[in-house]
Every structure is written in structure tokens, then in C-alpha cells.
């Protein structure tokens, strides 16, 4: 049965208009984005099938075009839509984070970092630069590449903080497909960076390690110098 034959109150678009987006399931929201299904499968049925295949909305939205194209009804158009949705969501979240008066809640930072870094396929490092009131000034990418290629120079982070007139900063990097547990190299790097930042009166508040499923805070683990 096509969605047009459903009772009006159960159709995803009508349901959204009547009850709001929060009332819709992941499959219903995805169906609105997909717009159409395939032969013998409504958009909602296709959405449910894709969610089951990929395991979560996040994994589906971040799937590579080649993997999406293996499913009937999916391809470059769907990949483009998903990429746009993710980027819009990331930018909205970044705006909300930047407009926050004070970043006193580590969970807010963790949520942003999970969204920003959690689905990256390579290791990416970023710095969150803050003013004296812990208000976000800017988010800057420090490096991108494989683990072997992902070299971060402490002097560059110091220069970045000074150029942005930051009073403090938070750094983060992801472990693609790995554990959020910090390595000995991560711990030693954090200590050296904290020492270097203290020489220019900039505080290193925390170091986060991000995976698609979790976020690890050095401060919460008692690893900050």
C-alpha cells in the first residue's frame, strides 16, 4: 500500500504538520527525506529497511556513495541529500554552541564533538578556542589524515590560540573505528601542549577522544596536567 492510501493522520508529512517533527520515528523522518520508495515498498518501508541494514540513522547518513548505491532506489542523489542534512545539522549545532554564554557543561561539548568527528573515516584533530568567560570563539581543524600522517605541531596550536586571542582551548581528535581510550602518546602530547600553553597564559581545559559511539574526556579521567 502506498503512503497516499494511508489514513491522513498516519502519513509522515501530515503527521509532522499536525504533531511536530519530534512525534515522528526515525523511519518516518527519513521517509520524508527519501520522498519515494521502490516497487512494492513505500518510502517508510524503504526507510525501515535501510535503518535495519545500516544499524542507525547516523551510520546511514554518513555512508559512502558506493555503499548507498548498492541498495535499490539509492544513489548519488540520496548521498547528496544526506551529506547536506549532516552539514546543516553540524552548522546549526556549531552556531548553538558558539552562542552559548558559557561552555560549563562537558556533555554539550561532547555531543558537538561526536557529531563533528564521530563519523569521520580518517583521524581528524580540532581545537575549540574560548574566551575568558569560556564562550566559544572559533573551531579550527588542526590536522586530517591517517594516524601515521596526522601530525600536530604544538607551536602551531600556540600560534593559533594567540592569533584568535583565546584565553583557553579544548582539543579533540577521533579514533576512526577504534576505542576512545587515550594512548600513551595522547597523554604525553597533552602534557607537552598544556605546558606550552601555560607559557603564553592560555589554559588547556580538556582533551577529548571521539568515536562514533562514545567520547572520552581527559579531565574526567584525571589525565589533565
From Swiss-Prot:
Q: Which domain of life is it from?
A: Bacteria
Domain (MPN): give its ranges. Answer: 102-224
Q: What is this protein called?
A: UPF0758 protein NMB1038
Residues recorded as binding Zn(2+), renumbered to this chain, are: 173, 175, 186
| Motif JAMM motif per UniProt: ranges | 173-186
Task: Provide the taxonomic classification.
Answer: Bacteria, Pseudomonadati, Pseudomonadota, Betaproteobacteria, Neisseriales
* Keyword Membrane in record: no
Q: Which GO terms describe its molecular function?
A: metal ion binding; metallopeptidase activity
| BP-aspect Gene Ontology terms | proteolysis
- NCBIfam families for the chain: PRK00024.1 (NF000642), radc (TIGR00608)
Q: Which InterPro entries match?
A: MPN, RadC_JAB, RuvA_2-like, UPF0758, UPF0758_N
- Report keywords, A-Z: Hydrolase, Metal-binding, Metalloprotease, Protease, Zinc
List the source organism: Neisseria meningitidis serogroup B (strain ATCC BAA-335 / MC58)
Q: Which Gene3D superfamilies match?
A: Cytidine Deaminase, domain 2
Family, as annotated: Belongs to the UPF0758 family.
Amino acid at each position: 500500500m502506498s503512503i497516499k492510501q494511508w489514513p491522513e493522520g498516519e502519513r509522515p508529512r501530515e503527521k509532522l504538520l499536525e504533531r511536530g517533527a519530534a512525534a515522528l520515528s526515525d523511519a518516518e523522518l527519513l521517509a520524508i527525506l527519501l520522498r519515494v520508495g521502490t516497487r512494492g515498498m513505500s518510502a517508510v518501508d524503504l526507510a525501515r529497511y535501510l535503518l535495519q541494514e545500516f544499524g542507525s540513522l547516523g551510520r546511514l547518513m554518513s555512508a559512502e556513495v558506493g555503499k548507498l548505491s548498492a541498495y535499490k532506489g539509492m544513489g548519488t542523489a540520496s548521498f547528496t541529500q544526506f551529506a547536506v542534512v549532516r552539514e546543516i545539522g553540524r552548522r546549526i549545532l556549531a552556531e548553538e554552541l558558539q552562542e552559548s554564554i558559557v561552555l560549563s557543561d562537558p556533555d554539550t561539548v561532547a555531543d558537538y564533538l561526536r557529531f563533528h568527528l564521530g563519523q569521520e573515516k580518517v583521524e581528524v584533530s580540532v581545537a575549540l578556542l574560548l574566551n575568558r568567560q569560556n564562550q566559544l570563539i572559533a573551531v579550527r581543524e588542526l590536522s586530517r589524515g591517517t594516524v601515521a600522517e596526522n601530525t600536530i605541531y604544538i607551536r602551531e596550536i600556540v600560534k593559533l590560540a594567540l592569533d584568535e586571542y583565546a584565553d583557553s582551548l579544548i582539543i579533540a581528535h577521533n579514533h576512526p573505528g577504534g576505542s576512545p581510550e587515550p594512548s600513551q602518546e595522547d597523554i604525553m602530547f597533552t602534557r607537552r601542549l598544556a605546558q606550552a600553553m601555560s607559557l603564553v597564559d592560555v589554559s588547556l581545559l580538556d582533551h577529548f577522544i571521539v568515536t562514533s559511539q562514545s567520547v572520552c574526556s581527559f579531565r574526567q579521567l584525571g589525565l589533565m596536567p
